[in-house]
Structures are given as structure tokens and as C-alpha cells.
Regions:
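Aromatic-lined carbohydrate-binding surfaces of glycoside hydrolases
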Residues: 1-173, 179-185
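Structural recognition of alpha->loop->beta junctions
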Residues: 186-191
């Protein structure tokens, strides 16, 4: 979002992706190897001037099924891979700082914000269908083995709850974190 604002272009437009290419080329030339992507809107709860926008659009269909639009995510990952940033894809976050998830409700045509605290039925209800679908999408793209669900300085209790759902729904995926609790010692699927 910051690049779009600074360049005066529409978010996720062709012009935005071209501006991102120029900016990310600097990172690639400096040796960057990890792609950072968002699973939902603003996983860091607007800690920056520009909130992080969602790269995957979640929609609850009128019939109660979930649909996920990976168009922006795919384009972002493909851009980064084309620059040689290809070590891992770290996706933030199953435990966003505000524990909120945003989706489009097809029946009402409106966005909905849900509070999904780790360890609650709502958390599992929201993340189970997504992780199963995301895993299939990543496998089809050939990215499953390099993709991690990433968390940023979350409590051990919150991470335990998230890891439990991740291991149940997508055990093939890795796990990455910025850790301020020495939690890294607890997880075998760390990459």
C-alpha cells in the first residue's frame, strides 16, 4: 500500500506491480530470499502509516461455502520469484495482532470483520476451510514445500492454538515466526 500511495497509483494495478518490481529489485540485489505475503487484511493491526492490504480475498458464498481469490497473492509471488527471491514464502498471519479476519459476505454484498481468537471455535471455523483450500492451491502452483504460515511475536498460547489447527489441516506446510518468547524451541515444523 505504501508503494501505491507514494507512486500515486491504484492498489494492485499494473502500475502498482511495476512500481513494486522496481522496489523489490533492490531487495533482490541485496540478497533477499524470503517472500512476505498476507493471508488476510492487515495482520500487523495498522502499525505502519499504510495498512497492509489483503493479498487473498475471502468470500462467504450465499450457500455457506468459502471461496478464496488468490489472484493478487499469485501475482505477488510470481513477481518475487521472477526477481530471484525464491527461498521461502512466509504468509502472515493466522494470528494477526488484532485477531480480526475480514471477508466479503456474498449474501449481503458487504465486508464482515470477525474476531477469531486462537483456541476458540470461531478461530477453527474460519481457518480450517481456508488452510485446506490454500494447501491445494499451493500444491497446484508448486509452492507448497516452500510456504510457511508465519506469526509475529504472538504468545505461546496463541501460537499453540494456531499450530494445532495448522497441523490438522495442512501438516505439509511449514511454520515461521518472529519470536519474543523463545517459542521456537517448541515447534518441530519450523523452517
Amino acid at each position: 500500500a505504501a508503494v501505491a500511495r507514494a507512486e500515486g497509483v491504484e492498489l494492485w494495478s499494473d502500475a502498482h506491480f511495476e512500481a513494486l518490481r522496481r522496489t523489490m529489485k533492490i531487495l533482490a540485489d541485496a540478497g533477499q530470499k524470503v517472500i512476505t505475503a498476507t493471508l488476510n487484511k492487515d495482520p500487523w493491526n495498522h502499525q505502519c502509516y499504510d495498512a497492509y492490504e489483503d493479498m487473498i480475498r475471502w468470500t462467504l458464498a450465499a450457500d455457506g461455502t468459502w471461496h478464496y481469490d488468490y489472484t493478487i497473492f499469485d501475482r505477488w509471488v510470481e513477481l518475487m520469484l521472477s526477481l530471484g527471491i525464491d527461498g521461502m514464502i512466509n504468509c502472515y498471519s493466522m494470528v494477526p495482532w488484532n485477531n480480526e479476519l475480514v471477508y466479503n459476505d456474498e449474501a449481503s454484498g458487504s465486508p464482515v470483520t470477525v474476531k477469531a481468537e486462537p483456541g476458540t471455535p470461531e478461530f477453527e471455523r474460519m481457518w480450517t476451510p481456508f488452510l485446506k483450500d490454500f494447501k491445494q492451491h499451493l500444491a497446484a502452483k508448486g509452492w507448497l514445500e516452500k510456504t510457511n504460515i508465519a506469526m509475529d511475536e504472538r504468545s505461546p498460547e496463541a501460537m499453540d492454538a494456531a499450530v494445532k489447527v495448522l497441523e490438522k489441516c495442512a501438516p505439509e506446510m511449514g511454520f515461521a515466526l518472529a519470536d519474543n518468547h523463545s517459542s521456537y524451541k517448541r515447534y518441530t515444523m519450523m523452517r
